[in-house]
Amino acid sequence: MSRKQLALFEPVLLVQALTDAVKKLSPRAQWRNPVMFVVWAGSVLTTLLTLAMVTGQIAGSALFTGVISLWLWFTVLFANFAEALAEGRSKAQANSLKGVKKTAFARRLRAPRHDAQADNVPAAELRKGDIVLVKAGDIIPCDGEVIEGGASVDESAITGESAPVIRESGGDFASVTGGTRILSDWLVIACSVNPGETFLDRMIAMVEGAQRRKTPNEIALTILLIALTIVFLLATATLWPFSAWGGNAVSVTVLVALLVCLIPTTIGGLLSAIGVAGMSRMLGANVIATSGRAVEAAGDVDVLLLDKTGTITLGNRQASDFIPARGVDERTLADAAQLASLADETPEGRSIVILAKQRFNLRERDVQSLHATFVPFTAQSRMSGINIDNRMIRKGSVDAIRRHVESNGGHFPADVEQNVENVARLGATPLVVVEGARVLGVIALKDIVKGGIKERFAQLRKMGIKTVMITGDNRLTAAAIAAEAGVDDFLAEATPEAKLALIRQYQAEGRLVAMTGDGTNDAPALAQADVAVAMNSGTQAAKEAGNMVDLDSNPTKLIEVVHIGKQMLMTRGSLTTFSIANDVAKYFAIIPAAFAATYPQLNALNVMGLHSPNSAILSAVIFNALIIIFLIPLALKGVSYKPLSASAMLRRNLWIYGLGGLVVPFIGIKVIDVLLTLLGLA
């Protein structure tokens, strides 16, 4: 990935965020955040009181009320600034994507073939189902599927990756994205979306936050914050008659200051910024999430379904050996295996052709001159091969070949069964080759487990996350690789139906499941999973079924996605703990100052030794505003994340953010009080 990363406090973003923060002072914008709306209402009320005192309409200290009013406005402004800065970072990322969208013309074909007559039309007029021809140097005008041709495509504008990729008809690499550029050859593309619905349009909308809705956890936390605000509002309202009855009524300004300091303004002011920043961090990892709900779900995941190839292993399985059946010589097996692999463009297929050439000098045959029919691999048949003259050669998984042999009246030899087990026990993948109903032998495909993957799985296990390896290999091979990699469980000989059933089984147990996929056959399982990361190189069906798209098409990214989700939840929880713990210190500052004249016994609570009642109240209000500014970097970057169990994580957060939330305000309020006294403002 080479996408430019934004600095946390980019000067241009700071200026724009300040402007947006002022715009957000409107009551319509404030109403979306009930906690900060109360602060906004208090700011308006104290401003009106200040004006009334200045004009002599009511008695009171206009200077004290005015300063309190000013810092209440700063509190609202700082909360707006945090949200605007988070949104500004997202909008900056979106603007880089908007630069990809270019007004262009498209060659709309009148028939679905490359030599059909074409009409030049604006790309904006293309509709779902239209067929277009795109040549070298052209911008692909729409999202779609390649139905003819093959070409190298520059997707750097979307993925940030400079290396071109191959897109061709058929298979799992037929999906193309509007806004990318053809570097060579040509493609005939069937548009799969209408204008405004392209992947790029959806990316921009998601990144800008225009479609951001509150997640379930955000809603639950907002309800808690509203409940606390109502409780403190009622408690504060009852204090006026108590103080009046005592003969020294507390001023409205002091009551407003008390209310603002007691309600959870810190988390209330940063909550929206945390959610926006979580989406932004996900994009920083080159993953597009369809919603904050998907990011949040990633933090709650406790089961990871991981494809073996490319995620757990390096994914470049190579043919290492030909093991013939009894009565078959190795050259005959190698010749049949090479024939069955001539049209197989997978790394495994090409390695079989090369191994046969190296071992027995078997040259690749001219495919056209063979007049053969090639049988492609499918997830259902789990085998591929060739029909040539009267020969029917197949290679595939053990079970698939066994069914094929038995359906043709043959018998699966015991010695081949033993060879399959021997290969599987070594952690290699056995492919069986058959001609007609006669089993010729086994091809061994070796793969290598990625370095450090076992340690990563151990960390996930410590966090309470179960890892399940998904593979098309037989049980013996799967068990050997699972043991080497250190996963908790595995699903061998996996079919799309088996994946879907496994996800439903875990969900029935109340667990949240995450998985990756890139093919059309993965779409049902992706749609069922709670967190479904589709590969950008995959099919349109897979991308539509998932709730995230990995622009790097790296299956290992699923682990990073879970880390980002957990970091967002931890950030929200940690700052909530800090915010509520803050109230205790502010209680010790304001209560004695506000009511000591009525109830002198309350002076015992002035443990900080604050200079005067006015300086105590003002210090608490100033600290309440400034702490939001100091916590903005933490809200945007997220708290430090370490793979720990839930109980260990809770203890750690209580010590750091609970105890910190108690201690920091005592120190901060006292320092501000001393400064106010030195400046003669106390």
From Swiss-Prot:
Its EC number is 7.2.2.6. GO terms for molecular function: ATP binding; ATP hydrolysis activity; magnesium ion binding; P-type potassium transmembrane transporter activity. GO terms for cellular component: plasma membrane. Mg(2+) binds at residues 518, 522. The active site is at 307 (4-aspartylphosphate intermediate). It is found in: Cell inner membrane. The chain crosses the membrane at residues 34-54, 58-78, 219-239, 254-274, 588-608, 616-636, 662-682. Keywords: ATP-binding, Cell inner membrane, Cell membrane, Ion transport, Magnesium, Membrane, Metal-binding, Nucleotide-binding, Phosphoprotein, Potassium, Potassium transport, Translocase, Transmembrane, Transmembrane helix, Transport. It catalyses: K(+)(out) + ATP + H2O = K(+)(in) + ADP + phosphate + H(+). It comes from the Bacteria. It is a multi-pass membrane protein. InterPro entries: ATPase_P-typ_cyto_dom_N, ATPase_P-typ_P_site, ATPase_P-typ_TM_dom_sf, ATPase_P-typ_transduc_dom_A_sf, HAD-like_sf, HAD_sf, P-type_ATPase_bsu_IA, P_typ_ATPase. It is an enzyme of class 7 (translocase). ATP binds at residues 344, 348, 377-384, 395. CDD domains: P-type_ATPase_K. Part of the high-affinity ATP-driven potassium transport (or Kdp) system, which catalyzes the hydrolysis of ATP coupled with the electrogenic transport of potassium into the cytoplasm. This subunit is responsible for energy coupling to the transport system and for the release of the potassium ions to the cytoplasm. Belongs to the cation transport ATPase (P-type) (TC 3.A.3) family. Type IA subfamily. The system is composed of three essential subunits: KdpA, KdpB and KdpC. This is Potassium-transporting ATPase ATP-binding subunit. It comes from Salmonella paratyphi B (strain ATCC BAA-1250 / SPB7). The lineage of its organism: Bacteria, Pseudomonadati, Pseudomonadota, Gammaproteobacteria, Enterobacterales.
